Amino acid sequence: MELFRYMEQYDYEQLVFCQDKQSGLKAIIAIHDTTLGPALGGTRMWTYESEEAAIEDALRLARGMTYKNAAAGLNLGGGKTVIIGDPRKDKNEEMFRAFGRYIQGLNGRYITAEDVGTTVEDMDIIHDETDFVTGISPAFGSSGNPSPVTAYGVYKGMKAAAKAAFGTDSLEGKTVAVQGVGNVAYNLCRHLHEEGAKLIVTDINKEAVERAVAEFGARAVDPDDIYSQECDIYAPCALGATINDDTIPQLKAKVIAGAANNQLKETRHGDQIHDMGIVYAPDYVINAGGVINVADELYGYNSERALKKVEGIYGNIERVLEISKRDRIPTYLAADRLAEERIERMRQSRSQFLQNGHHILSRR
């Protein structure tokens, strides 16, 4: 892998390698773009096949956070960390303390958070060494469990997509097929049930399905049958890549709006559902409630302020749909364009984030 050529191609700013022999820390911090502000992105711990695979993952995820944060209207850039190791057996306090010192050494250019393979407890240890971390324990002033807030954002985004498809954002009487009934999807189902939507649910966790059936009057189906249900809205809220060659021919929904990440297996599947007239709410726009919520911690967490910002996901989806119509492009491309246009407007007046007295961190 020719690192500098790759970084130049996608306009990355910085790649930081962090090593601590005593604790076993091997971490890679990727900072993609800080035009809008310091880079925010979680720390992932994973057993990568090679160091090159870890680098590629860090770079890819950091770029994704640039787009997610920009589209969400946050004054934050995109970054990501990967720690090479098995989160089940390689963790220790010294590792996360050492990592916290490396973050502190970046002087605010990068702010971390929990991700796959890391926990709130890990973030608390990092917090012992630096303030540039979010998603810590509520005892330290954090926002707590982000799932209800993420679900609320998905609910608002779904209403915006429904308005485009059906002429009204009311979900009363609409049938929504929800794939996955985990923490986020359960809270989404609660909002939908309260508005009077009819629910079809599936999950590999039978207890979660039974709970949704009992509490929301949902109808349960087998996991493989969720795609072919007669419904108005398909809400993927579990694994990614569920919009693919096998599932698209089965879909009867007019809207796809859910909490899952990386819903399109390939970009061409976004083209395909666009050509079919399906209104697709791009994943990283509609599921941004979690990152909006933790970002509010940087101001000193205020739940009312955070929820008001999350409600803005409705308008963000509307803008994506407007760009899609304006430029005659699928919504997944329109989401990228929304983020890129915001970054470009800011780039006119600043080129990169450097610590100063007038930015988001000065409010902490």
UniProtKB/Swiss-Prot annotation:
The UniProt record lists the keyword GTP-binding: no
Active site: K80
Keyword Lyase assigned: no
Biochemical pathway: Amino-acid degradation; L-leucine degradation; 4-methyl-2-oxopentanoate from L-leucine (dehydrogenase route): step 1/1
Listed GO MF terms: L-leucine dehydrogenase activity
Activity vs pH: Optimum pH is 10.3 for the oxidative deamination of L-leucine.
Catalytic activity, EC: 1.4.1.9
Subunit description: Homooctamer.
Purpose of the protein: Catalyzes the reversible deamination of L-leucine to 4-methyl-2-oxopentanoate. Can also use other substrates such as L-isoleucine, L-valine and L-2-aminobutyrate. The 2-oxo analogs of branched-chain and straight-chain amino acids serve as good substrates for the reverse reaction.
Family: Belongs to the Glu/Leu/Phe/Val dehydrogenases family.
Protein name: Leucine dehydrogenase
UniProt organism field: Bacillus licheniformis
